[in-house]
Amino acid sequence: MTTQPIISTLDSERLEPLVSGSWTDAPVLRLRALLGRASKVAPPQVPSDVVTMNSRVRVRYPGENESEALELTFPDAGGLSVLSPLGAALFGAREGESVECTGARVSRRVTVERIEYQPERERHFDR
């Protein structure tokens, strides 16, 4: 049984313009579907274990000893773009959850080990 994804109204408002229109690549379609089915809550009500925009997360790929630190960002912000296959897979995921990241030629699972920084948890709503 899967639970309904939870995202902030602020993230929803900022992402909607990015995924509306005629884009048909997989990450955009994935985000569009997530925005359509997610429960949208005010930023202070977002659970602290949900990957939101501008979160810093530590992820691990199966079979690898080292984890990787990533910051989920809007395009052109210098981090992992939410419009990339991995960024779209991580947005809305929960700590401890494994998600499928599907790129042009490869598909692999990645696990969110922990959320090191989440703006909502820190009450940073002006991001």
Regions found by a protein language model. Name each.
Residues 1-49:
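N-terminal intrinsically disordered, low-complexity, charge/repeat-rich segments that act as generic
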Residues 29-31, 59, 113, 120:
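Short, intrinsically disordered low-complexity segments
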Residues 45-56, 120:
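Peptidyl-prolyl cis-trans isomerase
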Residues 111-112, 125:
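A short, hydrophobic/aromatic-rich structural module that often spans a beta strand
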Residues 120-127:
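Short, solvent-exposed secondary-structure boundary/capping segments
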